Amino acid sequence: MYKDRKSIDLLNKIKEENFLLFRSVAAYLNEFPCLINKEIMEEIVGGVSENEEFSFALFLATALSENDDEAKLFEREYFKKSVKKLSADEYRENPYFKNIVIPRKKVSTWELGYQSYQPYEGFIYDDIEVMENYREIPKIGFFSEVFSFPTVFEDGVEWMAIKPNEIETMKPHVEKMSGDVCVFGLGIGYFAYMVNEKTDVNSVTIVERDSSVINLFEKYILPQFKNKDKITIVKSDAFEFAKKEMPKKRFDCAFVDLWHDVSDGVDLYIRMKKLESNSPSTKFYYWIEKSILSNIRWHIFEGILKRIESGNFSEPFENVKKYLSDDYLKNFVKFI
C-alpha cells in the first residue's frame, strides 16, 4: 500500500476537476462565446458595473455546470480567480496597436484583416495560472464594448491575431529580451515589433519558413517599424536553423512561437528543448509554456499512478510534487 495514498488521491481529484472545468470552458468558448451579452449583463447586475466580474463568473459557473455541486466548485475554485473585465482602451494604447496599421489585403491564400470581440463575449486572455496544489486556473476575459483586432487569415481561417491573449502571454517574454535576439515564428510581427522597440535590444533575427508570410510582413508591416535596420529575416525551418546555424550566432535570447495551441505545441516544444544544448549561451523562452507543461505534467502523473497501482512506486509524495513542477519538467523533456 502506497503510504502517501491520501495525498495522491487528492491530487488526482484536483486533476479530474481541472479536466472537467477545461472541457466545459472549451465547449463554451468554441460553441457559445456570446452566451453572456449586453442585455443579460444589464439584467443581472442591475446597472452596477462594479458587479460585472462577479456576476459574469457566477452566471458562467451556473451555465457550464450540470448540478449545484459543480456550480459551486467552478465558481469558488476557478471562476472567482479566473474572470476579469478588461479595458479596451488599455489595449488600444499598446504600441503595436497605436503605431502599426494593418491594411485589408489579400495575397494568394493569405489575407490581412480584422475581427472583433462583442461586448461580454468570453475569451482566454492569458496563459493558465498554476496554483501550489496544481489546480489550474484558465484566464477568461471580456470587454464591455466592441473590441477589434488585426488578424491574418489563411484560406479564410484565422491563422494569427493580435488579441489580448497574444499580448498578455508575450508580455513577460518581451520584458526579458535583451542583446541579440532570435525569434522563431513571424506571425504578423507583434513580438518582433515589441522587442525591436527596446533600447537594450541590439538585433532581432526572425526565423520563418513560409515565404508568403514573410512577403506580407515585408511589404505591409516592416516598413512601419522605426528601427528596421535591427531586423533580419531568415527563411528557414526553425529546427534546422536551431541545429545548424544558431550555434554560430551566439544569441543572447530566443523566443519560440511555432504553434497555434497546446494540441500542436507539445511535440514542437520538446523538439526545440532538445536543441537548447547546441546554443548554451542563449536563454530560451517559449510561448504558452505553462499550458504546454500542464499537458506534459498530467501525462507524467498518469504514469506515476500506474506504477503506484502496480506496486512499483514507493517514493514520498514530496518527490511526486517535484517531478510535476515546472522547473523539473523543463529539464526532463530534453531527455524524452
Describe every region a protein language model picked out.
Residues 1-143:
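N-terminal auxiliary segments of SAM/dcSAM-dependent transferases
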Residues 210-249, 261:
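S-adenosyl-L-methionine
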Residues 255:
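A conserved beta-strand element that flanks and buttresses the S-adenosyl-L-methionine
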Residues 146-150, 164-180:
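Conserved alpha-helix/loop element of class I SAM-dependent methyltransferases that forms part
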Residues 178-189:
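Conserved class I S-adenosyl-L-methionine
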Residues 203-208:
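Conserved SAM-binding motif I beta-strand of class I
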Residues 188-200:
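Conserved SAM-binding loop of SAM-dependent methyltransferases across substrates and taxa
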Residues 260-336:
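C-terminal substrate-binding/active-site "lid" region of AdoMet-derived donor-dependent transferases
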